[in-house]
Amino acid sequence: MKFSLAVSFFILMSLLFEDACSKEKSSKKGKGKKKQYLCPSQQSAEDLARVPPNSTSNILNRLLVSYDPRIRPNFKGIPVDVVVNIFINSFGSIQETTMDYRVNIFLRQKWNDPRLKLPSDFRGSDALTVDPTMYKCLWKPDLFFANEKSANFHDVTQENILLFIFRDGDVLVSMRLSITLSCPLDLTLFPMDTQRCKMQLESFGYTTDDLRFIWQSGDPVQLEKIALPQFDIKKEDIEYGNCTKYYKGTGYYTCVEVIFTLRRQVGFYMMGVYAPTLLIVVLSWLSFWINPDASAARVPLGIFSVLSLASECTTLAAELPKVSYVKALDVWLIACLLFGFASLVEYAVVQVMLNNPKRVEAEKARIAKAEQADGKGGNAAKKNTVNGTGTPVHISTLQVGETRCKKVCTSKSDLRSNDFSIVGSLPRDFELSNYDCYGKPIEVNNGLGKPQAKNKKPPPAKPVIPTAAKRIDLYARALFPFCFLFFNVIYWSIYL
């Protein structure tokens, strides 16, 4: 029993809370709702009678009291000519990924409606500036943007609509719009490309028998100096045209278009893409000047170059649309990637030459043969220097070794003056105490008469590098820069 009472109480409180919330919402809606304007044709005779007879409001009421906005001017007669012009407030940059651009414009339309001719007793100016709320009471062209993706009106602080009614029945409407328009891009020459973006104004429901759009004579599109981050747009490059379309089953529909020519500025891509990738390619060539057996230095340099170029390609691919054709930037990046990869392949070929046993043995044989030839030349020199008894012939040509020897000549008189006639020509570091009387090096004995032990380790053997490996590096130093320079000449002559 207690449980059922608790449930009933909970349900009752929930209903009361829901009712209170609904009342609060309805009161907020009532406060936020604007007062609805009634057209003169919708007002009662009593309301119209309250307006002073000689006032401007009364003149407007007289014009619109029998006006039907559902019927176009000159019904069943000549088509209505609507003169169109546009003032561009701002022009957004083109988005390559979505292939569109955004503009903020004042759209102005002017047509003649004989039903709105001001009466002859109107003593004011030649035009009436009418409140925008009256715009819905008039007939208006059903203009829409054929290549529009999204659009919106502006209503801060009031609806951005300007309405004029002229004495002869001309109606001028100006409204502020922000529109995102599609612009199919041809990126074959990207980033040295020039794009042509259209804005098409078309009638939605009226055929050419009822309505025609006409560009205003003179400058139908007014464009202030606009600075875009990536493009240059000039007033002289704007083109106008007619794009009247035929739809099967309904007929021809009037359409006018304006074409904007936008030339891309290459500076950003020169500094952000071309210069860094060029430097990476040049960096990969440094490996040709590094010793062929220094794989610890050459391999990381080549891998770094290839990975950096691949990363640049991936980053740019994410910022551009997925198109099926090759862009100019793709050609550059692929070429740079191939040059970086080729430098890595070049070192692989050098390593093959370096580790080829036949080439290594052939190089060792060549070196041994050269040393043998040098040895024979040394012996001949020695024979010319020392005679058969060991007597020096020309002491300045004695081979002074590193072995330090003990003095054995007891006095200078032991020297044969006829043999050492040019002692004065000895080098400064030549110590006579280390040589015997005939200029031959002798061993130095310790106190026990044993030769002094030499603990010096023999130097490590030099790696044998085949001549073919060195020749490949030598050719690469000239071939790679020449090929890259040739590619640059062809590339820039085509795309610039």
Curated annotation (Swiss-Prot):
List of residues binding glycine 1: R108, S174
A GO molecular-function annotation: extracellularly glycine-gated ion channel activity
Disulfide bond residue pairs: C183-C197, C243-C255
Segments on the Extracellular face: 23-268, 316-327, 496
Record field: transmembrane: 269-289, 295-315, 328-349, 472-495
Site feature: Important for obstruction of the ion pore in the closed conformation: L307
Reported function: Subunit of heteromeric glycine-gated chloride channels. Plays an important role in the down-regulation of neuronal excitability. Contributes to the generation of inhibitory postsynaptic currents.
Protein name per UniProt: Glycine receptor subunit beta
Gene expressing this chain: Glrb
